[in-house]
Amino acid sequence: MKNTPNRYLIIALLIGVVFHGFGIFFTLEGTYDALIHLFFADHYASHWFEPWNYSWYTGFTVMGYPPLVHQAIAILSLIGGLKFGMFTVAIIGVILFITGVYRFALLITASAHAAGYAAILAVFSSSFVETLHIFGQLPSIIGVSILMHALPEIYLWLTSGKKKYFLTSLSLLAVTVCSHHVTPIFGMVFFIFPLIGMAVMDEARTRVNTMKEITFPVFLKAFFRLLKRMIAFGISALFLIIVCILPYWINTKNNPITQVPIPHGSRDNFLEITSSGLVFFLIPWGILLLLMPYFFYRYYSKRYLFFGLSLTMLTILGTGGTTPIPKIILGDNAFNILTLDRFTLWGSIMVLPLFGEFAYRFAEGDYKTFLSTKLGGLYHRILAGILAGLFLGTTVFTMTLNNFRPSQPDPINMLPIVNFLNQDQHYKWRFLPLGFGDQIAWLSAQTDAMTVDGNYHSARRLPELTSRAIERLENSKFRGVEGIGSLQQFLTVPEKYNLKYVFSND
């Protein structure tokens, strides 16, 4: 029996690598963000120590994004090219996510069986499938996965005080910071702070006979006993967050985002724009919505109280503009800059340990015994089949969503365009792609030619772009007179931007 939990994890890893490793060859290049990260990787592969990239927006600094994932793709590209590096990092992300969920679940539930179930369920998590196969957010996946690996180390440092856990927790946190800037900042609030609260609860529990005997004075005494360790970790973590991506903070200070907010579906009112509600709320939560009462009931028990508060906050923030609450909490500036689907992603990840616990109890534990006794084994199996069908059905639907509702134009043959730009010194002039979608990043990665447009909107500095609520110039047609006016500024005076060629796929 001792090997069973490890067998669950091994099964999860094998299924995850095969399922996602096979799937990404059909989905990853058609996602929103994957090719953008490939473009950044191309920059590091060509000019590792150059902080500026001149391919987009008449020049921008790559210091506006933590470099680890991009640099990893760049290094791997030396073996098999940029796409090889991108696919390899994606598979590494899958492995890190599954093992991260296992360790996080083991920390929360203290049950290797439940953690094993959580790891298997993580493979088919609709929020993870969407993040990887629809959004292509590789840094987010790597960042949150490493953060989950860091949580047990942080807990062990707080409860045991052993220096090796202090060093491992900070090392993993440093990797998280270098992977994705938003994850450690909000991870401190939504994951690490609740973890500290749970550690204090466990410390208080050692001084009493039962959890019911933990009162506020008992909790407060335990808090002060761990205070030195918390302060040591907090100061060190803050130091790492600042130092590890210091160029990012300097760039943020010198070049704050002042552009007109670009609309994003995660900020919509999901009751009015149901398509946004489907993509940014129903799909990532999936079948987990049916089990929300169980998750809140468990997380609002005394030991997990702070995780319950965190889950509540994440759930509310993930509703976007459906209610005014997220905007009140975040403030106008953060609300208009952040994409709020990240909160739903983190919320769905936070409940995975309890989802694994529920699945274990339902498949092998007390829930199975109760249902089999009350209703009979047949009804238990039917109910299990329905739940499994809904869960896997949501996964398959999410995986194939782009087939029903394409988010990108059909794949474009870049070779003729690349050949044209690379011959007769055409690359000395700027070009403007229209109707390319996110494939603009793949085109830019294959040529030295520059474009007035781009696909990393936070880096834009041209007033002609920052004064309009459009992502790329090709989207100007959707913004009426305002959008067309932005495009006209480039087409009527192209010499101002050294613009000579327009490639239209629209």
Model-derived features: positions:
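Luminal/periplasmic acceptor-recognition loop/helix of membrane-associated glycosyltransferases
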Residues: T451-K500
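Short periplasmic/luminal acceptor-recognition loop of GT-C membrane glycosyltransferases, typified by
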Residues: N422-L465, Y501-N505
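Residue-level recognition of alpha-helix initiation/capping sites
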Residues: L96, I412, L434-G435, G485
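Membrane-embedded transmembrane-helix bundle of lipid-linked glycan/lipid transferases
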Residues: M1-L421, W442-T447, Y456, V493, ...
